[in-house]
């Protein structure tokens, strides 16, 4: 049912060590990233072996919970979730329930409110994931995945592990090559520019192993990734402005369409599982 057996089989195969962890079924910057640390890096070995790309169509569909009927800025759709979860650990990919913990529109623009809303229940011991989603003024959609809830750490300590990653989604034309060739052969006119269908193209930037600056949050900002004095992604305490730079932790590109500095139009945090 929904290919769940397929996915469970892949988990067993992953545990047995017979699957290929870092598949190229998604777009990443790993080829251009700085050289990874050696295989003795415990921070890296702890997580990357668990990451598997499950075959398309074999995962159960995602259900999004938490949007109010009055919410105007709804940043995610199940189709977008399918793209984002390709880089998650296999067991997290299998969760069908994505629960909205924080929304800039629904809960107000405050980093303190974000931390309060995403704080896990002390009785909850199940392993889950967290997805940060941001929309900028040019309608760019990007964000991050975290293995733990975002929380302030005033001791200048980085948290998180090698499961974390940065990502962005771009709308691109959905071109069917076979249909295009058939149309050209028959001499038919193609669709008008405005009628072209589009799809989401996912670009993921997984942990490189170069450093261990996965997550760093304080009462003044939330950030993921760093190196050479630059943050991969940073949001200020008012959740009004942010910064995105290429960083060593994730080998990422600038995530926002606005450039290295961007304005936050909408922001959400989801719990996966």
Swiss-Prot record:
Q: Which residues carry this modification: Phosphoserine?
A: 178
What is this protein's function? Answer: Involved in protection from oxidative damage.
Q: Which Pfam families match?
A: TLD
What keywords sit in the KW lines? Acetylation, Mitochondrion, Phosphoprotein
Phosphoprotein among keywords: yes
Induction (free text)? Up-regulated by heat and oxidative stress.
Q: Where is the composition biased (Low complexity)?
A: 18-33
Name the GO cellular-component terms: cytoplasm; mitochondrion; nucleus
Boundaries of every TLDc domain copy: 74-273
Q: Mind telling me what this protein is named?
A: Oxidation resistance protein 1
| Source species | Saccharomyces cerevisiae (strain ATCC 204508 / S288c)
Which biological process terms from the Gene Ontology are attached to this UniProt entry? Answer: protein retention in Golgi apparatus; protein-containing complex disassembly; response to oxidative stress
Q: Corresponding gene?
A: OXR1
Skewed-composition ranges (Basic and acidic residues): 37-48
């Amino acid at each position: 049912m929904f290919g769940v057996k397929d996915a469970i089989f892949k988990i067993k195969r992953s545990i047995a060590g017979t699957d290929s962890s870092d598949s190229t079924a998604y777009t990443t910057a790993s080829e251009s990233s700085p050289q990874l640390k050696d295989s003795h890096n415990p921070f890296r070995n702890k997580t990357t072996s668990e990451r598997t790309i499950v075959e398309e169509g074999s995962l159960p569909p995602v259900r999004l919970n938490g949007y109010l009927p009055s919410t105007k800025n709804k940043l995610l759709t199940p189709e977008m979730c399918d793209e984002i979860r390709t880089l998650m650990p296999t067991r997290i990919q299998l969760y069908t329930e994505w629960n909205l913990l924080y929304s800039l529109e629904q809960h107000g623009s405050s980093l303190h409110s974000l931390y309060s809303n995403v704080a896990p229940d002390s009785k909850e011991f199940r392993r889950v994931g967290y997805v940060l989603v941001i929309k900028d003024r040019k309608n760019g959609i990007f964000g991050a995945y975290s293995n733990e809830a975002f929380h302030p750490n005033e001791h200048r300590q980085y948290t998180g592990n090698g499961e974390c990653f940065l990502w962005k989604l771009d709308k691109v034309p959905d071109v069917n090559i076979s249909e295009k060739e058939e149309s050209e052969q028959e001499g038919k006119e193609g669709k008008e520019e405005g009628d072209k269908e589009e799809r989401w193209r996912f670009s993921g930037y997984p942990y490189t192993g170069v450093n261990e600056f996965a997550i760093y949050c304080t009462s003044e900002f939330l950030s993921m990734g760093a190196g050479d004095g630059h943050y991969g992604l940073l949001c200020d305490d008012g959740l009004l402005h942010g910064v995105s730079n290429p960083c060593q932790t994730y080998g990422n590109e600038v995530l926002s369409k606005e450039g290295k500095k961007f304005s936050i139009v909408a922001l959400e945090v989801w719990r996966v599982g």
